Amino acid sequence: MCYIRPTESGVFKIEDCTWNTKTPFASIRRIVQDRKEIFRIRPGLWALEEYRSLLADRGIVAQDVTNSDSVQVQEFNHSYYQGLLLYIGNMKKLETYVPAQDKNRRCINVKLGEISTLTEVPPFSYQEFVNRSSTIDVMWFQPNSLGNEVMMPDSFFEVEHSTDIQNSLCKFSDLQSFNAQMFIVADARRHDEFIAKLNHDYFKPISDRVKFVSYDKLDRYYEGLMTQQKSSLVL
């Protein structure tokens, strides 16, 4: 199986081959866009055309106007971008958490529970707050030398492909007392909807704290971190 996707272990591992360019991801992106035998699954994620049907049987499908609202696409997007957020948090040396009900979902071929570093939400406050946060799609926590018991949340992320953004904003509102960043991750086409919901009077206390991150922007950020980590990319 061939996925064209930068990971922490590299891209296309081939012995005795070095990628001698300062912009490997831009070069890869240009190459795959010009090759008919390669198709785009998501921003930054490509595969060989000959595996399209096999990948679809495994729930990995290319999104287009005909299937963007299908259950298969929704489930894939949700777990895929949860996975990216976990990988990013790990690269930033933060502790990462994904809800218990999502641990067996996969980001391509890796279970989310195998990417996250925490198996339980750290007891950072009263149990009611801990319980409320436990269903947030991805959380990052600041490591603490004193142990998990005093670990505080760094960032909250909710991935919203087609579900109601307002539900996520309600979670953030309930957790506004904590000095954590708050993000809605979604298709760029939902930005106007995000602004409209956030402008509701109920969410005024958090209106300056919640940020919108598009799928494309998240992918570019991931690639940027990978570029910083590797002065040269081994293929």
Where are these regions (language model features)?
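Catalytic cores of nucleic-acid endonucleases
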Residues: S125-I136, N148-S214
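Hydrophobic, Leu/Ile/Phe/Ala-enriched alpha-helical segments that form helix-helix packing faces
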Residues: E15, V32, L85-K93, L198-Y202
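Positively charged, polyanion-binding regions of nucleic-acid-associated proteins
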Residues: M1-P6, G10-F12
